[in-house]
Every structure is written in structure tokens, then in C-alpha cells.
Amino acid sequence: MGLSPSAPAVAVQASNASASPPSGCPMHEGKMKGCPVNTEPSGPTCEKKTYSVPAHQERAYEYVECPIRGTAAENKENLDPSNLMPPPNQTPAPDQPFALSTVREESSIPRADSEKKWVYPSEQMFWNAMLKKGWKWKDEDISQKDMYNIIRIHNQNNEQAWKEILKWEALHAAECPCGPSLIRFGGKAKEYSPRARIRSWMGYELPFDRHDWIINRCGTEVRYVIDYYDGGEVNKDYQFTILDVRPALDSLSAVWDRMKVAWWRWTS
């Protein structure tokens, strides 16, 4: 979904949102129409805004593997019809030591102003993104298997983050019956949040990464801060990160949510 080495997010904007799921794949044949709770919403509860599509999400479904067929679309199906070339971020680097998968996995995270979901980067996209940020693969002992594991961990971190956001958003289920969707997100690895700095002063470690996720709550933009902490050894589900997810204190509503949850945790 994102494309930075730490835990990826790029918000390059574009206007082409014509990507469609791979043909013949049952998982993408149906499309949700409207709000599942209220099919003809009125008023602010299901208000929609128009958001531009991040470049790395364009044509993303062309690389999503169909679980029935077991293989991704290849060759001509993946070429840009305008120049018969694959998208640049799926092109192997000139000195790349081994081949990497271009298959992309669909997330469970709804994309704002769309019936589609966000799609995670492929191994090749992740590799290219790291190179672009100055990473030197020759300085690392890295293999194809390592890249596979990196993608699995990255995807699991994002799924875990969204689950935590949904817990907070449950406080607003009445005002937003359609549920939230993700507009954009970005990494701020070295911009430690006040909460992280206070924890550090108390003797705890600083997070190894930070993301800010901007969600659409039925017409209202809400920012969430996510601090990523090392949780030790990676388990079989590729989970090793401890996430501290909470709404940013950008509004009285967010302050009230934080106060309520803090009280519940204190008294439970």
C-alpha cells in the first residue's frame, strides 16, 4: 500500500482511477453499491468528498493475484497500452541480483471515494522504493526470501493498524454508519510524537517508525497517529510490531475520545 522502506506510504497524486479488477476473478466481480447500512443516505452521515488517486494505486488491481487462478496476470496484460511497457515501479533495477515478484495483494482497507480497497506494493515496487531513498543492497545480506518476508510484515502492520483505527471509529458508528475509509497516509519516522517523547523520558524505547493516517469519517477528515515499536521475534503470522494507535488531538471530538478511552482503560 505504501512505498517507504520503514513502513511505506507515498501520496503522489494523479487523476486516473480507471483501474479494474482482473477479469474472471470471483473475489472482485461484485461491487458494493452505496452504504451497506443505508442504501440511500441523506444528510451528513454518508457524505462523500472527491479525493485524487495516489499514483501507486493506479492499475493496481491488474497485479492483484486471483486466489482461484493462483497466478497474477502477466506479459501483455500488465503492459501499459500507451507504450507497451510495464509501469516504472514494477521494472527490475539494472543491477538487481535476483528476480522479484510483481504480484500485489489487496488490503482490507477501503479507499476513500472508491468502491475499491487499497492495494499493497509488490516485492519489486518495495525494492525500487528503497533504492530511490538511497538504500544500497550491496551493503546488506539480503535474499529473495527476505523481500518476501518484508512484504508480509509490511502488509500485516497495515492490517493491524486499520483494525486499531476501527476500534476507535466504533465510537462514531451512529454518526457514520457507512464506516471510515482511508484517504492518505505518510511516514514520519524521525518526527516523534509528544506521546512517544514522554514515554522515552520515562525510560521506554522510542518507536522505530511513525505514520499519520488521514481517514474519511463520512465527510469529516480525521487524522490518526501510529507509533511502531519493536515487539521482538516475528511470529508465524508475520506480527512483531506493537502499535500505539490513537486519534491526533486536532479537534475537541478527538480529545473527548481520548479522554473516554483513557477512563475506560483506567477503570476496567
From Swiss-Prot:
Any transmembrane segments, and where? none
Q: What is its EC number?
A: 4.4.1.17
Renumbered to this chain, region (Disordered) spans 1-25
- Record InterPro entries: Holocyt_c/c1_synthase
| Annotated consequence of substituting residue 211 to A/G/C/Y | No effect on holocytochrome C synthase activity
Q: Name one GO cellular component term.
A: membrane
- Asked if the Swiss-Prot or TrEMBL record annotates the protein with the keyword Lyase, the reply is yes
User: Reaction catalysed by this chain?
Assistant: holo-[cytochrome c] = apo-[cytochrome c] + heme b
Q: What is its main location?
A: mitochondrion
Instruction: List the molecular function annotations (GO) for this entry.
Output: heme binding; holocytochrome-c synthase activity; metal ion binding
Q: How does it sit in the membrane?
A: Lipid-anchor
Keyword Iron-sulfur among UniProt keywords: no
Keywords linked to the UniProt accession: Disease variant, Heme, Iron, Lipoprotein, Lyase, Membrane, Metal-binding, Microphthalmia, Mitochondrion, Mitochondrion inner membrane, Myristate, Repeat
* Chain positions of HRM repeats: 24-29, 34-39
At which residues is a lipid of type N-myristoyl glycine covalently attached? 2
Q: Which ranges are annotated Low complexity under compositional bias?
A: 1-22
Recorded superkingdom: Eukaryota
Effect the entry attributes to changing residue 217 to C: In LSDMCA1; loss of function; no effect on localization to mitochondrion
Biological process per Gene Ontology, one example term:
animal organ morphogenesis
State what this protein does: Lyase that catalyzes the covalent linking of the heme group to the cytochrome C apoprotein to produce the mature functional cytochrome.
Q: Which PANTHER family did the record assign?
A: CYTOCHROME C1 HEME LYASE, HOLOCYTOCHROME C-TYPE SYNTHASE
- Return the similarity comment: Belongs to the cytochrome c-type heme lyase family.
- Which clinical disorder is mentioned? Linear skin defects with multiple congenital anomalies 1: A disorder characterized by dermal, ocular, neurological and cardiac abnormalities. LSDMCA1 main features are unilateral or bilateral microphthalmia, linear skin defects in affected females, and in utero lethality for males. Skin defects are limited to the face and neck, consisting of areas of aplastic skin that heal with age to form hyperpigmented areas.
The entry's protein name is: Holocytochrome c-type synthase
* Source organism of this protein record: Homo sapiens (Human)
Record lineage:
Eukaryota, Metazoa, Chordata, Craniata, Vertebrata
Gene (UniProt)? HCCS
